UniProtKB/Swiss-Prot annotation:
Protein's name according to its UniProt entry: ATP-dependent clpX-like chaperone, mitochondrial
Source organism per UniProt: Rattus norvegicus (Rat)
Record's compositionally biased regions (Low complexity): 84-93
Domain ClpX-type ZB: 93-146
Residue spans of biased composition, Basic and acidic residues class: 69-83, 598-610
Cross-referenced Pfam families: AAA_2 (PF07724), ClpB_D2-small (PF10431)
Modified residues (N6-acetyllysine): 437
Protein family membership: Belongs to the ClpX chaperone family.
Length: 633
């Protein structure tokens, strides 16, 4: 009898195991099975073992249905309505409302209801008939899940090989010359830095992946359709495990699970392999750049012009809006978010980009308030330290909600950072360090420390009468001797200065350079105003003496090239008011007009006798616009 009982229990266990395996292959399900057990001595009893219903989860894409009941893929569905994209946000309980907005079970065709959770826009629905749970996905989400998969190292190699060969530094320099006048040293530094950035991206790729990419490029292999399918299956499987509360990493809650890449990264040499290796591959490190110079000297224009001629993503970020983590303002991660946006949210491409940090001097720390938190100064510098050196930054994903916390990991190791700032008063700090008098008499010897004290001293010196040319030459001479300790005294922390090894001082603009800026480069100031007047069929003539007078006025204002536009707007205000819809065909500006001794000269078209109807504002005669009251002139 014991053998019979053992045999019976073994058969029951086998049936139970077979049923469990079958259920596991079909998904997590519930049901009832008959298990024979031993009752009283010598009798065989059969009891019904009930299991608590387990939730069954499935994942199905939502297809759009037309009015005639035909799905997007062309298959008819009879009277059953397909799941629409907008229906995942509405309640699907009951039969009221439009039939197209109701969710139906893919297995039995019965109506599904939404699962109430703390998230208002839940995607979980439940079939009341077969008690199955489903995750509603649209076609866009299905495609997005494939794109979400992290690209492998081979993809980065292919991206590097798909790009055009890097332009030589001389070609970049000549391109910058067309838009930026002067600053030859800064243009050389930026041209060489960009060229070396291209070479560093190529060199830091492992040799085996580089050879593989070259072979694939030459043989032009077939598309990665099988790989995409495999990634899709893997993503769906891990997604279902998360929903069911089973994590591949052993986490019972299944809260955070990093997506696994399709290919493994090449293993680096570790431990004894490094000791036994006769040679190591050279890994090129980046050299971040710091541009410093007076306002209006062309720092931002250099960055904007450089961004047009590059094949790598380029982002210009304003440091004045950055704050320390946890405070109101833009987070430091927004710097990489702008670069990722310029790369069209391609992570591998963004990791090879260039970031231009403008107005970096505005985040200098202010001495004397160490007992308080400098959230817009020293706190931002501390947050930028690892970003400049190279770290993995979690950037919020495109169109992601803060509640979900979806982020994209971006490695900043190969991202080149170029910082720029005016650093007003830095020349006075250098002069004090060198124990030199600054432009003669009256220089205080007990200057305070920090950027505020330096800027205040520089502003006080501007109020006095001094030779503008001598002032410019003295500042340029002192800025050429800038050292790291001068920047530290200005308010930059030593760790931040050490991560910007290349310091490039920009010289101030003299009168000759300002005259060239007015006329020579592409998109110059004078051609812009000539184009404005040409739209009203009028010419603008500015004499050489007038150009020199405008340059001298800009030098006196000490605002660099930005002062040129302010002066031109003031000079041409009356002509721009008089010319539209008039018989003025030419405006002449000479030296006396710039000095304010007379008004601009006008050349008018010869008047012709016409009827009153021809003086309409929309009528043009002989190519010249005419006003309604032109006869009075």
């Amino acid at each position: 009898m014991s053998s019979c009982g053992a045999c019976t229990c073994g058969a029951a266990a086998a049936r139970l195991l077979t049923t469990s395996l079958t259920s596991a292959q079909r998904g997590i399900s519930c049901g009832r099975i008959h298990v024979p057990v031993l009752g009283r001595l010598g009798t065989l009893d059969t009891q019904i073992l009930r299991r608590a219903p387990l939730r069954t989860f499935s994942e199905t894409p939502a297809y759009f249905a037309s009015k005639d009941g035909t799905n997007k893929d062309g298959s008819g569905d009879g009277n059953k309505k397909s799941v629409t994209e907008g229906s995942s946000k509405k309640s699907g309980s009951g039969n009221s409302g439009k039939g197209g907005n109701q969710l139906r079970c893919p297995k039995c065709g019965d109506l599904c209801t939404h699962v109430e959770t703390f998230v208002s826009s839940t995607r979980f629905v439940k079939c009341e008939k077969c008690h199955h749970f489903f995750v509603v996905l649209s076609e866009a989400d299905s495609k997005k899940s494939i794109i979400k998969e992290p690209e492998s190292a081979a993809e980065a190699v292919k991206l590097a090989f798909q790009q055009k060969p890097p332009p030589p530094p001389k070609k970049i320099y000549n391109y910058l010359d067309k838009y930026v006048v002067g600053q030859s040293f800064a243009k050389k530094v930026l041209s060489v830095a960009v060229y070396n950035h291209y070479k560093r991206i190529y060199n830091n790729i492992p040799a085996n992946l580089r050879q593989q990419a070259e072979v694939e490029k030459q043989t032009s292999l077939t598309p990665r359709e099988l790989e995409i399918r495999r990634r899709e299956d893997e993503y769906r499987f891990t997604k279902l495990l998360q929903i069911a509360g089973i994590s591949p990493h052993g986490n019972a809650l299944g809260a955070s699970m990093q997506q696994q890449g399709s290919q493994q990264m090449p293993q680096e040499k570790r431990g004894g392999e490094v000791l036994d290796s006769p040679h190591d591959d050279i890994k090129l490190e980046k050299s971040n750049i710091l541009l410093l110079g007076p306002t209006g000297s062309g720092k931002t224009l250099l960055a904007q012009t450089l961004a047009k001629c590059l094949d790598v993503p380029f982002a210009i970020c304003d440091c004045t809006t950055l704050t320390q983590a946890g405070y109101v303002g833009e987070d430091i991660e927004s710097v990489i978010a702008k670069l990722l946006q310029d790369a069209n949210y391609n992570v591998e491409k963004a990791q090879q980009g260039i970031v231009f940090l403008d107005e970096v001097d505005k985040i200098g720390s202010v001495p004397g308030i160490h007992q308080l938190r400098d959230v817009g100064g020293e706190g931002v510098q501390q947050g930028l330290l690892k970003l400049l050196e190279g770290t993995i930054v979690n950037v919020p994903e495109k169109n992601s909600r803060k509640l979900r916390g979806e982020t994209v990991q971006v490695d900043t190791t190969n991202i080149l950072f170029v910082a720029s700032g005016a650093f007003n008063g830095l020349d006075r700090i250098i002069s004090r360090r060198k124990n030199e008098k600054y432009l003669g008499f009256g220089t205080p010897s007990n200057l305070g420390k920090g950027r505020r004290a330096a800027a205040a001293a520089d502003l006080a010196n501007r109020s006095g009468e001094s030779n503008t040319h001598q002032d410019i030459e003295e500042k340029d001479r002192l800025l050429r001797h800038v050292e790291a300790r001068d920047l530290i005294e200005f308010g930059m922390i030593p760790e931040f200065v050490g991560r910007l090894p290349v310091v490039v001082p920009l010289h101030s603009l003299d009168e000759k350079t300002l005259v060239q800026i007015l006329t020579e480069p592409r998109n110059a100031v004078i051609p812009q105003y000539q184009a404005l007047f040409s739209m009203d069929k009028c010419e603008l003539n500015v004499t050489e003496d007038a150009l020199k007078a405008i340059a001298r006025l800009a030098l006196e204002r000490k605002t660099g090239a930005r002062g040129l536009r302010s002066i031109m707007e003031k000079l041409l205000l009356e002509p721009m008011f008089e010319v539209p819809n008039s018989d003025i065909v030419c405006v002449e500006v000479d030296k006396e007009v710039v000095e304010g001794k007379k008004e601009p000269g006008y050349i008018r078209a010869p008047s012709k006798e016409s009827s009153e109807e021809d003086y309409d504002s929309g009528v043009e005669e002989d190519g010249w616009p005419r006003q309604a009251d032109a006869a009075n002139s």
